[in-house]
């Protein structure tokens, strides 16, 4: 009885995976990636520079913390 329930569980999992593969299509377009790419050109250089400076400051802080 235990083997039958394990077999049924495995078959059910495989059916779910097969259904997910069958419902996927490449004709959906860019999806979320297309929306991100469209808004990336709207970023200002000042914002990018501020983010770069923030990352640089955090990296320097991490290096200072690692010194013995």
UniProtKB/Swiss-Prot annotation:
InterPro entries for this protein: Adipokinetic_hormone_CS (IPR002047), AKH/RPCH_hormone (IPR010475)
Q: Which GO terms describe its molecular function?
A: hormone activity
Please give the residues making up the propeptide in this record: 34-68
- What positions are modified (Glycine amide)? 30
Please list the residues that carry the modification Pyrrolidone carboxylic acid.
21
What's the name of the protein? Answer: Adipokinetic prohormone type 1
Which Gene Ontology cellular component terms are annotated? extracellular region
């Amino acid at each position: 009885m235990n083997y039958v329930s394990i077999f049924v569980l495995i078959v059910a999992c495989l059916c779910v995976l097969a259904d997910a593969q069958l419902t996927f299509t490449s004709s959906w377009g860019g999806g979320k990636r297309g929306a991100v790419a469209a808004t990336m050109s709207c970023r200002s250089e000042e914002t990018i520079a501020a983010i770069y400076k923030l990352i640089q400051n955090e990296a320097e802080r991490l290096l200072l913390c690692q010194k013995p």
